Structure formats: C-alpha cells, structure tokens
Amino acid sequence: MAKLDAYFGEYGGQYVPQILVPALDQLEQAFIDAQADEDFRAEFMTLLQEYAGRPTALTLCRNLTKGTKTKLYLKREDLLHGGAHKTNQVLGQALLALRMGKKEIIAETGAGQHGVATALACALLGLKCRVYMGAKDIERQSPNVFRMELMGAEVIPVHSGSATLKDACNEALRDWSATYETAHYLLGTAAGPHPFPTIVREFQRMIGEETKMQILAREGRLPDAVIACVGGGSNAIGMFADFIKEENVRLIGVEPAGKGIDTDQHGAPLKHGKTGIFFGMKAPLMQDEHGQIEESYSVSAGLDFPSVGPQHAHLNSIGRAEYGSVTDDEALEAFQILAKGEGIIPALESSHALAYALQMAHSEPEKEQLLVVNLSGRGDKDIFTVHDILKEKGEI
C-alpha cells in the first residue's frame, strides 16, 4: 500500500486514540487513490471552476503603494464562493467522503468560514453536516452561524475551555471517534493528525499555482515575496506549495501578535511557542512552563489558534519560510486602508498579511519589489467587530 510521509522534518505525525487509526488509514488510501483517478480530479476541477469560481483574480493595488517602488498584487480568494479560500479544500474533502461512502460530515470552525464552506459543500453534495463552534466564536460571528443553518447544517456550541477554536477541534475529534464508520471529519486547516496536513495542502495548492501563472503573464517574472496570514496555515501553505522550490521567492507567513508579542495575548506559536503534542500532531504550541496549553488570542477568530500546521513548522526550522507577526491594531489599520484605498473589504485574518506587506513597501520606499499577498477571505463577517472597536476608540 502506498504511503504518504507522516512527518515534515520532526513535525507532524499521528497522535490520536488507537480507535481513529483505521479511519485515518482509510482516508490516506482514499486520497492516494483519488489523486491517481482522472475522473476524481476532473470532478474536483469542474466544481472549483463552475461552482466556486476559479481561477480567482490577481489584482494590482493601484493606490496602496503610492510613493514607493513596490508593486503589490492581491490573490483574490475573497472572490471565491463562500467568501474565503476554505471552499477549495472543503470541496475536495467532501468528494473524498462520498468516495469512501460516508453520509455525514463533522467539522470545526473558528471564524465560521470553514463551517460555511463545509455547509455549502454538504448542501451541494447531499451530505448531512454538523459543525462544532466555540460559544465565544458563535457570539462574535453570528452572521456565519445563520448562514450555516440556512444551508442545513447543525451548529453545536462548545462551552469548554476558552470556548474557541481549539475546544471545537477537540469536540469534533471526540465525535469522530464515536462515528467514524459513517462520518468523515472534514478538518479545516493544514494541521491535525496525518494525513490531514498533506490532504489540505494538496487541495489548496491551486492558489499558488494560479498565482505563479498569473504573475508571469502580468509581470514576466516571479514575485520577490508571497505573503499570507498563518493561523493553522492552510491559505499560506496553499500559496507557498508551488513556490517552495523557487529559491528566489521569499515565503512570508504572518502570525497574529494580538495585543503585542510581549504580552500573553497573541497567537504566534511559531516564534513564541515550544514543541508539543496537540490536536493529533507534534508542532509548535503555546504552552506554559508546566506544559499546559496557553490560550491564544487574536482580534481575528480565524487566527485564534495556539498551534500551527507541521509543514510551516518545518519550513521555519530549515529557514525556507520566514514568519513575522502583526498586532490587532496594525491589522485593523490595514483593513481600513484597503477598504478606503482600493474598495476591497478584507477579512481580518487577511489584513494581517496585508499589514506586513505594507510595512515592507513603506519601510523601504526606494526598493523595487514585486509582492503578492494572499487575500484569503472577504471581510463581510468582520464589519460588526471592526465597527465596535472603532466606536470604542472614538474613531467613528
């Protein structure tokens, strides 16, 4: 039986209850078979093009880098059906679930974007859907909760722990342990137990593949850097995957610095965590001196995650990718700059990557550079959060 690598360097693996190993083995084999099946690939591509709206545009920012020699492009995953990059890999995994004869889908969600993407794929493909979501996230993302319910999903609130994404992940895994014979756990990011990080990367890699073709057509060369926000890391690994072998292209991931990296309110495990076991994988993890998981924090629910995907950990450890961080305030500023400057309202998650790119452009205005930001999602879900913050600050 063909096998995929379970590790990226020292990171990854499959740290799960023994009861789940057969389900993960079945998933790995189904994925390997599907990747070799022309009909499966054709069906996936058809859904991406005719239902989700691929390829997505690559948009040159006309106004954001005025006064500098930077050319800044946005890869417009915000234009995808469902509002974010999540739709790509969800369609792939839902097709895999059908291929394995599963009738139900379990998912976890933070910002609600993965939940919405899962709900729409299940509605389209006739699968029953239940989504675990932290009670705190349900409060801050009520429009997405109703979207999921409109499309027939059952949204299950999780009150344990910090009542956020990590707790929803734990509940979803617990459910799957009891129901894996009939249900597929549709994990929402490039993290978790093997083979999920690899499956999610492969079902997101068209982001970077399209970007490469589009930038070559527009500029006649590859970008100097591609920049993406990193929570679990799926939009970033989707952008990075096709550029890893292009040694002259910098890969820059941006973690949430929250209220400041020097505070205890951030979500930057790559730079400020220690290796641990969490969510079925070995990866950098925010933990205290006793090894207890520390709460992550970000204004953006989708980046509020105390660990990170194992391939990012590996790329960081070998120096192939670099990882910076951006605070809530910097992300909020970038959110407003893009809205006012280009007429595009980005997700708060994506605003972290944009903020980093703008810092690169304006800190060296004389440097000629070609940058691509993965605009991983649109900001409709965040307008009430931003409104409340700006009102509190007296800015509106």
Curated annotation (Swiss-Prot):
CDD domains membership: Trp-synth_B
Cofactor(s) for this UniProt protein: pyridoxal 5'-phosphate
Keywords noted in UniProt: Amino-acid biosynthesis, Aromatic amino acid biosynthesis, Lyase, Pyridoxal phosphate, Tryptophan biosynthesis
PROSITE patterns with a match to the protein in the record: TRP_SYNTHASE_BETA (PS00168)
Catalytic reactions on record: (1S,2R)-1-C-(indol-3-yl)glycerol 3-phosphate + L-serine = D-glyceraldehyde 3-phosphate + L-tryptophan + H2O
E.C. code: 4.2.1.20
Pfam families in UniProt: PALP
Enzyme class: lyase
Modified residues (N6-(pyridoxal phosphate)lysine): K86
Known pathway: Amino-acid biosynthesis; L-tryptophan biosynthesis; L-tryptophan from chorismate: step 5/5
Gene3D superfamilies membership: 3.40.50.1100
GO molecular function terms noted in the UniProt entry: tryptophan synthase activity
UniProt-listed NCBIfam families: trpB
Family stated for the protein in its record: Belongs to the TrpB family.
Protein name: Tryptophan synthase beta chain
Organism from which the protein derives: Aliivibrio salmonicida (strain LFI1238) (Vibrio salmonicida (strain LFI1238))
Gene encoding the protein: trpB
